[in-house]
């Protein structure tokens, strides 16, 4: 296969082995899932987004989201907020923690975030973006990045200009989800805007949106020239996507999808990691959504999802998966 892009690259001084990035997703990219994705070949991991204000209040639940394991490196910590001075202070206060890159969320479409002027609401105010990125990047020595969407309904957002502002303000890279805030995750991602941003800035551009297979990753690179490929919803229940993309981009060959035995073992390993981190009660309950994702589209998956909601411990989960095999 022709070489589409460099496999090894950098964000600031941080070396990254391949361009395949786990997107930050609330309720998904916690510590256990990030480790599983790393083992399958993710080049860069991103934490769940954490509130700068909650960090400043030493909120216990927020602090727990910031836990990082040494095996994860390189890993990006994503924060969100709208107050430049507070965000800079928080960035400085957490810099000694073992993350490699600090990312600023400017794309979250969720109402409770947007209504606070945070996440994608920042797109309405380019000068506030400039102030936030400038102050945060000056406050820390680690590379600072930003993740944006390409528009906000009712406002004349110019995503290319915003990317330029982010670059000029000291960011080391920008990730672009090719959808507006109004779209959430509906419709097709606008890869052409990602291409225009890539042509307009000199920092690395990470493309995000609609990449759910090695072939789609290839298409994104061909259409945009992006430096990194960020995978979000398609990785839920599918950490193998990183293995498949690495293999395809280096050999041109498509790997077979994981067998049921591989899926079963991944579910059980994931469950053990969740239990170790959060205890059996919480760990097993948090696995329910992951089980739905792991088994989506499989025969008997509807019954398995239903039955998994009744499981309360690891032994019951193991038995349920064994029964599923025998159906």
Question: What are the roles of these predicted feature ranges?
Answer:
Residues 9-21, 55-75, 108, 113-116, ...:
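N-terminal small/glycine-rich loop or linker at the start of catalytic domains
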Residues 1-8, 12, 16, 20, ...:
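Alpha/beta catalytic cores of nucleotide-metabolism and tRNA/nucleoside-modifying enzymes
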Residues 2-10, 25-100:
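Glycine-rich, positively charged N-terminal anion/phosphate-binding segment
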Residues 39, 88-118, 127-203:
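Alpha/beta enzyme core
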Residues 20-24, 45-47, 75-79, 102, ...:
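Hydrophobic faces of well-ordered beta-strands that scaffold small-molecule active sites
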Residues 25, 50-52, 80-82, 107-109, ...:
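Active-site beta-loop-alpha junctions enriched in small/polar residues
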Residues 123:
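Aromatic- and acidic-residue-enriched carbohydrate-binding clefts of CAZyme catalytic domains
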């Amino acid at each position: 296969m022709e070489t589409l892009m460099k496999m090894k690259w950098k964000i600031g001084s941080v070396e990254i082995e391949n361009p395949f990035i786990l997107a930050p997703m609330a309720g998904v990219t916690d510590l256990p899932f990030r480790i599983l994705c790393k083992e399958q070949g993710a080049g860069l991991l991103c934490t769940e987004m954490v509130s700068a204000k909650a960090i400043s209040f030493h909120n216990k639940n927020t602090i727990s989201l910031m836990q990082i394991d040494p095996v994860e490196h390189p890993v990006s910590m994503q924060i969100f907020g709208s107050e430049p001075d507070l965000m800079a202070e928080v960035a400085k206060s957490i810099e000694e923690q073992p993350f490699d890159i600090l990312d600023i969320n400017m794309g979250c479409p969720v109402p409770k975030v947007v209504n606070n002027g945070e996440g994608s609401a920042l797109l309405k105010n380019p000068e506030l973006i400039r102030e936030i990125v400038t102050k945060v990047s000056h406050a820390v020595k680690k590379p600072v990045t930003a993740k944006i969407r390409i528009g906000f309904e009712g406002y004349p957002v110019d995503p290319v200009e915003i990317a330029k502002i982010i670059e000029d303000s000291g960011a080391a890279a920008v990730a672009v989800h090719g959808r507006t805030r109004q779209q959430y995750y509906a419709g097709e991602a606008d890869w052409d805007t990602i291409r225009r941003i890539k042509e307009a800035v000199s920092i690395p551009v990470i493309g995000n949106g609609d990449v759910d297979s090695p072939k789609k990753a290839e298409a994104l690179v061909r259409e945009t020239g992006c430096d990194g490929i960020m995978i979000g919803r398609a990785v839920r229940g599918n950490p193998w996507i990183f293995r498949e993309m690495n293999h395809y981009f280096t050999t041109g060959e498509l790997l077979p999808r994981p067998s049921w035995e591989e899926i079963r073992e991944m579910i059980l390993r994931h469950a053990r990691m969740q239990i170790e981190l959060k205890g059996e009660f919480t760990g097993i309950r948090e696995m329910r959504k992951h089980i739905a994702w792991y088994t989506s589209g499989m025969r008997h998956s509807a019954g398995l999802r239903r039955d998994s909601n009744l499981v309360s411990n690891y032994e019951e989960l193991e038995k349920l998966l064994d029964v599923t095999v025998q159906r």
